[in-house]
Amino acid sequence: MKTNKLYECTAIIDGGLQDEAVAATLAMVQRVITEKGGTINSVLDLGRRKTAYPIKKKSMGYYVHIEFNAAAPVIAEIERVLRYEEELLRYLIIQLTTPLLEMRKRVEKYSVVLGSVEEGASTSGDAEGSNE
């Protein structure tokens, strides 16, 4: 019996492509995941960013993060297809384990708490600047 596990795929698409080509490449990645038996849970579009170092002689990349459920044997098939896509500069698929999910929940909880403190500090700083 094949049980589905939770995975995440972070992909860097060539940043030099037009928006339509980037959207087509993203749609292709999603199609590959669903055709191979995966179920996409969420897609986080991080946009164009400068890479830390040149990848395939490119310094700009379009970052996308996809969470999906799939059976373990399907991952090798997905990677086999993605490996030969020229538009993808890099990709990484990892399994989301319970400790990693728990750590994410803690980070989200603390970022909400810290975010509200930082927002309060910035509004009080704005009020002081307007009095001058």
From Swiss-Prot:
One of its GO terms (biological process) is translation. Keywords: Ribonucleoprotein, Ribosomal protein, RNA-binding, rRNA-binding. GO terms for molecular function: small ribosomal subunit rRNA binding; structural constituent of ribosome. Transmembrane segments: none annotated. The keyword Ribonucleoprotein applies. Binds together with bS18 to 16S ribosomal RNA. HAMAP family: Ribosomal_bS6 (MF_00360). This is Small ribosomal subunit protein bS6. It comes from Chlorobium chlorochromatii (strain CaD3).
